[in-house]
Each structure stands twice: as structure tokens, then as C-alpha cells.
A protein has these predicted regions:
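Anionic-ligand binding patches
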Residues: 2-6, 12-35, 39-148
Length: 148
């Protein structure tokens, strides 16, 4: 069965989640028709947007154009109120090295150490984007989970 949708990511967890969501929403879609970027040799997309929305839409659009498949992409991170939305799009590399969750968390907590707990509100923000290969359809949605 040929791929129909490509996830603009090589994250196995995201692929599993996307397959579950889409095959439930679209019963005619088989799980193996949803593939990750590496499976179809999609190039890495530079995330140089200044918002979650811009990065997600860029990844979806470029991946769809490169593969000829419908593409889904996301960009997400933590937005701390007292830090005016930082670390934001830099969440995964806040401490310098991309993907070092412990270092990112340690640095963020150190930066907030003199802030009273009552003023440590934050949100997890996720932008999910969809694009068709011809560029005619592009859409992005934002989800936000607020905590304190």
C-alpha cells in the first residue's frame, strides 16, 4: 500500500500518535499509509520561523512539496508568562544542545528560582499544520494547555 500522508518528523512517538488519530478519523486510511519523513527521504527542514505556527507550516509545506504527499507537521514548546513567552520556539534547545530535556529544565528552573511560585504560570503550546503537495491547501491550528 502506497503512502498517502507523511509526518514531517522522524519521531517514532509522534508517528504512532498520528497514525492512531488519523486512522480513527478516516477509517479508509490504513496505518501503513502514514509514514515518517525518513521513509520517503524527505529533506530536513530548517525551523527558522519566529512562531510555532510559522515553523509548523514551513515543515508541512516543504515536506509536501518534496515528497508529493499530504504532509502534517508540528512545532511546540513551553511559554512561560513571566519570561514573555520564552523559551517558546527555543524550548528544545534552551540550554544549548537540542533535545537535552534535563538541561533545558534545569536552566529554566534556575532562571525562575527568584520568581515566586504564584508568578510561574506557563503554557504548553503546539501548532499543527497540514499542507498538500500543490500548495493549494495549507492550514495550521494552535493548541494551548495552560498550567501554573
Amino acid at each position: 500500500m502506497d503512502p498517502v500522508i507523511v509526518l514531517a518528523s522522524n519521531n517514532a512517538g509522534k508517528l504512532t500518535e498520528l497514525r492512531a488519530i488519523l486512522t480513527e478519523a478516516i477509517p479508509s486510511l490504513a496505518p501503513e499509509q502514514i509514514v515518517d519523513a525518513a521513509t520517503v527521504n524527505a529533506p530536513d527542514v530548517v525551523e527558522d520561523g519566529v512562531t510555532f505556527e510559522a515553523n509548523a507550516l514551513k515543515k508541512a509545506t516543504q515536506t509536501a512539496q518534496a515528497t508529493g504527499l499530504i504532509a502534517v507537521a508540528d512545532d511546540s514548546g513551553l511559554a512561560v508568562d513571566v519570561m514573555h513567552g520564552a523559551p517558546g520556539i527555543f524550548s528544545a534547545r534552551w540550554a544549548g544542545k537540542h533535545g537535552d530535556d534535563q538541561a533545558n529544565m534545569d536552566l529554566l528552573l534556575a532562571q525562575l528560582s527568584d520568581i515566586d511560585a504564584a508568578h510561574r504560570g506557563a503554557s504548553f503550546v503546539c501548532a499543527a499544520a497540514f499542507a498538500t503537495p500543490d500548495g493549494a491547501t495549507r492550514h495550521v491550528e494552535i493548541g494551548k494547555l495552560t498550567g501554573d
